[in-house]
């Protein structure tokens, strides 16, 4: 069974076992506008919580996407190279950015559930 967490920087994580799928929230993509380019981390990259892991560029601005937890990148969403707008269309489904192997599950305790995130974005 998977569980979804959210960060104050508007990333989401879907946890399945030891693997976290990471992306930006629907709210974040709405604020950015139409995405035109996504720069993703390489597989094998070790990330620490808070590291700048990816960049999403829209017609408005370029924004860093931060690693919500410590872990190793094990897969990236190759489809975004040809169609970065997938993030706009389905930010919390097919528009995921990367998958990572968790190093410390206790870090999840500092993240928000969906209800807390909805309060954050008002």
Curated annotation (Swiss-Prot):
InterPro entries: 2-oxoA_DH_lipoyl-BS (IPR003016), Biotin_lipoyl (IPR000089), GCV_H (IPR002930), GCV_H/Fam206 (IPR033753), GCV_H_sub (IPR017453), Single_hybrid_motif (IPR011053). GO terms for cellular component: cytosol; glycine cleavage complex. Residues 19-101 form the Lipoyl-binding domain. It holds the Pfam family GCV_H. Signal peptide: none annotated. The modification N6-lipoyllysine is found at residue 60. It comes from the Bacteria. The keyword Nucleotide-binding does not apply. Its cofactor is (R)-lipoate. Keywords: Lipoyl. Binds 1 lipoyl cofactor covalently. One of its GO terms (biological process) is glycine decarboxylation via glycine cleavage system. The glycine cleavage system is composed of four proteins: P, T, L and H. HAMAP family: GcvH. The glycine cleavage system catalyzes the degradation of glycine. The H protein shuttles the methylamine group of glycine from the P protein to the T protein. Belongs to the GcvH family. NCBIfam families: gcvH (TIGR00527), PRK01202.1 (NF002270). This is Glycine cleavage system H protein. It comes from Bartonella bacilliformis (strain ATCC 35685 / KC583 / Herrer 020/F12,63). The gene is gcvH.
């Amino acid at each position: 069974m998977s569980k979804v967490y959210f960060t104050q920087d508007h990333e989401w994580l879907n946890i399945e076992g030891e693997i976290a799928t990471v992306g930006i929230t629907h709210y974040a993509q709405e604020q950015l506008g139409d995405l035109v380019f996504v720069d993703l981390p390489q597989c094998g990259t070790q990330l620490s919580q808070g590291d700048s892991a990816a960049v999403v560029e829209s017609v408005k601005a370029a924004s860093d996407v931060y690693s919500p937890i410590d872990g190793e990148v094990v897969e990236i969403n190759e489809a975004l190279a040809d169609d970065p707008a997938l993030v706009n269309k389905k930010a919390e489904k097919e528009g995921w950015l990367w998958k990572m192997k968790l190093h410390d599950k206790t870090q999840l305790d500092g993240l928000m559930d969906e209800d807390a995130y909805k309060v954050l974005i008002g």
